[in-house]
Regions:
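Structured C-terminal portions of repeat-based eukaryotic scaffold domains
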Residues: 164-226
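Solenoidal tandem-repeat scaffolds enriched in leucines and small polar residues
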Residues: 115-192
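Internal amphipathic alpha-helical repeat/solenoid segments
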Residues: 1-85
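Amphipathic alpha-helical segments of tetratricopeptide repeats
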Residues: 56-57, 76-77, 96-97, 115-116, ...
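TPR-repeat structural position
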Residues: 3, 45, 65, 85, ...
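TPR repeat positional signature
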Residues: 9, 20, 27, 45, ...
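Structural motif corresponding to the intra-repeat A-B loop/turn of tetratricopeptide repeats
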Residues: 42, 62, 82, 101-102, ...
């Protein structure tokens, strides 16, 4: 039956993953290190990284999110140790994707580790995307203050790369929450006006400026009322 076949495939994937983890550990063992006097230690490390990544993929396939995140973390730590920083950041992002299924706080920690690497490498668009992801995770958990902070950071990094469209999306989130949740109307007004003035300078966006200016007017009315 189909359910039996599915269970069998999951079982096979997990068994393969366990074998790959075991293989990686052997390659990194001191005994293995001494065997590489005539070989390449670097190659063994690369092999171990590959084993951990493949194990992560297999655990992910079987929806064993905890083991998958652990395998990606081990790969990421090894990559970082050997200065493969971009690869390490990617591993941490993969670990976070698995962790967000059951442990959002730890998922966020991994995303922050990846952001730190991407900022150091000058890859600000990647850093912005991950801040945006963290903002969404906090938003889902209704932790809106933290969410807004990360939307702001995402907007800043998008600005660095002159990516106005995505920066604007994040800033609108900040302004909407500033006005609707926190009663910070002055902050919201400044953001809405900034967005409107930019839209007015860009011919194809001019029509959008009305929305932002209307929201700014509403915020002014709220200040007058309260």
């Amino acid at each position: 039956s189909q359910p039996d076949q599915a269970r069998q495939l999951i079982s096979q994937a997990e068994e393969q993953a366990r074998q790959l983890i075991s293989e990686a550990e052997k390659k990194l063992s001191p005994k293995s290190f001494f065997q590489t006097i005539f070989g390449s230690y670097k190659n063994r490390t690369e092999d171990a990284i590959e084993c951990y990544q493949k194990a992560g993929n297999l655990y992910r396939l079987s929806k064993n999110w905890f083991q998958a995140s652990t395998a990606y973390k081990l790969s990421g730590d090894l990559n970082l140790e050997h200065n493969n920083r971009s690869e390490a950041a990617n591993d941490y992002v993969q670990a976070a994707k698995c962790l967000e299924k059951f442990d959002v706080n730890n998922a966020i920690k991994f995303l922050l580790s990846a952001i730190e690497i991407y900022v150091d490498l000058g890859r600000f668009t990647m850093a912005a995307k991950l801040h945006n992801k963290i903002a969404e995770l906090y938003e889902q958990g209704l932790e809106l203050e933290e969410s807004v902070q990360h939307y702001e950071q995402a907007a800043d990094y998008y600005r660095v790369e002159d990516n106005y469209v995505y920066s604007k999306k994040c800033l609108l989130k900040v302004a909407d929450y500033a006005s609707s949740e926190f009663g910070n109307y002055n902050k919201a007004i400044n953001i809405y006006q900034e967005i409107a003035f930019y839209d007015l300078k860009t011919q194809i966006l001019q029509y959008n400026a009305k929305d932002s200016l209307f929201k700014a007017v509403l915020c002014h009315l709220c200040i007058d009322l309260f």
